[in-house]
A protein has these predicted regions:
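Residue-identity detector for threonine
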Residues: 7, 28, 32, 54, ...
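CoA-thioester-processing core
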Residues: 1-43, 58, 73, 77
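C-terminal alpha-helix plus adjacent terminal tail
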Residues: 47-53, 68-133
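Well-ordered beta-strand positions
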Residues: 1, 42, 46-48, 54, ...
């Protein structure tokens, strides 16, 4: 979940002559998965900087807000997330990340495993609280 402003900029400058390296912490992989092969090549090979509006159009960011509101918007979004069940969010994140590298069938199997485990835990918690009441 990425929030930026129109004046935000994004760049992977490693191909520039003064650097002459590649991103060393997964930048090529993650960027390609987020914005696609063609746009990733454009950014990576050229070292081109893109602004917030382009990042939004390319799917690199989800939301564009005025520059002075980026921090407040991010905090507000985090507060909304914090009200939800952290274990649910953690397992949803696991499923989403798993889906990136696996076919639909395997993704569904993984989701069903996590779902079943969560139900077992919920039932155990409920049974435990009934016994102690």
């Amino acid at each position: 979940i990425r929030i930026a402003s129109e004046i935000s900029f994004f760049c992977l400058p490693e191909a520039k002559p003064e650097l002459g390296i590649i991103p060393g912490l997964g930048g090529t992989i993650r960027l390609t998965k987020v914005i696609g092969v063609s746009r990733a090549k454009e950014m990576l090979f050229s070292g081109k900087m893109i602004r917030g509006k382009t990042a939004l159009e390319w799917g690199l960011v989800k939301t564009l807000v005025p520059a002075k509101e980026v921090l407040n918007e991010s905090i507000e979004f985090a507060r909304k997330l914090a009200k939800n069940n952290d274990i649910s969010i953690e397992n949803m994140k696991k499923c989403i990340n798993y889906a990136v590298d696996h076919d639909t069938r395997k993704g569904i199997e993984y989701e069903v495993e996590l779902f079943a485990e969560m139900i077992r835990v919920k039932l155990a918690e409920k049974n435990s609280s009934v016994r102690t009441a």
